[in-house]
Regions:
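Short acidic/polar active-site loop segments enriched in Thr and Asp
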Residues: 128-129, 152
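Conserved beta-strand-loop-alpha-helix junction that forms the acyl-donor binding cleft
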Residues: 131-143, 160-164
Length: 192
């Protein structure tokens, strides 16, 4: 079951964040040398904000292994962040970001669990009607996951990121949380 990280989890998240950026640099706009997600003080402040959350799955305990000490927390193996837009013009939207599952734990439902937890939080925010996210062209499994949760593609940003001279497109996706759009339509299929 996903947990919502608190300020005290900032060091654990920063460790996983560094692995994320090194494992899949094409999937994230940040790099280890300029990422605020590696700054513990920044993370502690962000995690204390009600309009910001990171959901995570912890490494399950191994059968037959002694339990961890009271102050020793398990490593994080999957995460998804969500933030409610603060601008009055975009207050009806939230954005999911930083979705990652450790390679050894992929394909086991951990990604789905943390993204679903983020969507559930967005549903609890009064006035939020849409959840947005982006997925790199190299992230086929992630795009399939998002589509299975109801996200639809609405645009493709050519050459959104560049790493070591290679450029990657990004697919922009949205999820309408409830009911039809204001014009009576319902985004139920990709527009690209």
């Amino acid at each position: 079951m996903p947990i919502r990280l608190s300020s005290s989890d900032a060091p654990r998240y920063a460790r996983l964040r560094l692995r994320m950026l090194l494992d899949a640099p094409w999937a994230f706009g940040a790099s280890p040398e300029n990422d605020k997600g590696l700054d513990i003080a920044h993370l502690e402040k962000a995690l204390a904000d009600d309009a910001y959350a990171i959901f995570a799955m912890e490494l399950p305990p191994l059968a037959g292994v002694a339990s961890r000490g009271e102050h020793e927390k398990p490593e994080l193996i999957a995460v998804a962040g969500i933030v409610r837009q603060t601008s009055p013009k975009y207050h009806h939207r939230a954005s999911i970001w930083g979705v990652f599952v450790e390679p050894a734990h992929r394909g086991q439902g951990f990604g789905r669990a943390v993204v679903a937890a983020a969507i559930d939080l967005a549903r609890s925010w009064p006035g939020v009607d849409y959840v947005d996210l982006g997925a790199s062209e190299r992230a086929d499994a992630a795009r399939r996951l998002y589509e299975s949760l109801g996200f639809v593609a609405w645009g493709r940003e050519p050459e959104a990121t560049e790493i070591d001279g290679r450029r990657y497109d990004e697919t922009h996706m949205t999820l309408r949380l409830a009911g039809p759009c204001r014009d009576g339509t319902h985004p139920s299929h990709s527009v690209i």
